[in-house]
Every structure is written in structure tokens, then in C-alpha cells.
């Protein structure tokens, strides 16, 4: 379960994209997820974005989920197994499921990748081998220490994201790329608000395939980066989401308990 942004303190974690990342819970069943989430939720004086338990309880949405939207634009490239998982989940939940179109929600990935890379670029700047992070053994000066330490410690995917983030924040790209991504985020949030005016939750795939083999990952090392197409909507909006039975449920803010109740039935 990925809780609503602000439910759990991020203090003590390695920051990547501070405006959207959350501390989530992975467990074998919904009951355990709920128990752990109850234990870790609440305000932390060292994290200004974390909310007090009283405020979380006050904002909690406990409305029963009876009507779910399935977004067609998020189903286009998924395998037959994933489509079968969606159908199976709907049948088990016994809710009304309606297929809708929303190219806005499908635009979450490019917008989130821009924002995430830009924030990541700033957040990892501290890992220079002096005070934080890996320290290279061989260097002839401070500049070479920075270069060697980061070259040795960072993987290819991280380096790619840093370069992309740096370009995104450059003077020539800031307004036409980064600022546009911020405005796109606002539009996506508004789109979810419109959907939730008619539906109680959104159901989309968690991945394009039901499972991946080691060979799949070796053949395409960027596969996990591509799969965030399905998790980006919840990340960029800060909405809660639950993955169970190969499907993903996204709910209204602070509706984690209701989502977990559904997850226990899938």
C-alpha cells in the first residue's frame, strides 16, 4: 500500500523526489499492511510534510467503494494475463466497473519523470564522497574525488536521470519543460477530482505483464523505468494506492483503509 502523501514521515530515508514520494508498506496480506501503516503513520517534527494522526483521522475517507473507473488509456499495452487479472478483481469485488477514457491520466508518466529527475538531480548532489555516500580511494584533488566517487557509486539508470534532471532545470528548459510538468500535475489532480465526483476509486494495472523473468530484466535494463507508466498517476498526485492480485486501486486522499479492505478480497 502506498499511503496518501504526508501520512508517513520521510525523515531518515534517502530523498529522491520529495514532492511525491512516500514511505509505503509491502506485506503478504492487507491486514498486515494496515497494521504496519497504523504504526508508522503520524506527524514527525523533523518532517514538515507529515500530518498529525488526528488530522489524518479527520480527513479519512471511509465511504464504501461501489463504483470503480477503469481507464482505457492505461490498458492499451498490457498483456492478456493482466487484463484477466482486472476482470477477475472486478468479479471478486462485486462492484460496478465502468471503462472510461482519460488521456490526461496517461500523461502522468512523462510529467512525473520530469519532476522526479529534476528533484533527484538536486537531492543526490550531497553524495560527493566528502560527507555523504561512497568515497573513491584514488583521487588527486577535490574535483577528482567528486567525479570518481560519483562515477563508482552511481548506476547507469541513476546517472541518466541526473543528466536528464540537470537539463530539465537549465535556463533554456526550465519554463518549457519543468514548469510545464508542474502545470500538467495540476491538470492531472483536477482530472482525478472529476473522476472521483462520479466514481469511488480507479482501477488500473500495476505492470504491463503479470510477471517478469530474470531474462526479461537482463534483456531490457530500463524495464522498471518504463513500468512506472502505471504507478506514476498515484505518485504525481500523492493519492493512495494499493496493489493486490496484479491490479492497482487508486482512491481518494486518505482512503487507505477502504482500499485495503478491497485488496483483502482480491
Segments predicted by a language model, with ranges:
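Charged, often glycine-rich, active-site loop that binds/positions anionic groups
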Residues: 110-123
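A short helix-breaking turn/cap at a secondary-structure junction
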Residues: 2-84, 144, 148
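Glycine-rich, small-residue loops and helix-cap segments
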Residues: 40, 92, 119, 126, ...
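Conserved beta-strand termini and adjacent loop/short-helix elements that scaffold enzyme active sites
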Residues: 71, 98-103, 206, 244
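Short helix-loop-beta junction
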Residues: 83-96
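Flexible loop/turn segments at secondary-structure boundaries
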Residues: 22, 76-78, 107-108, 171, ...
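Flexible, glycine/charged-enriched surface loops at secondary-structure junctions
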Residues: 46-53, 95-103
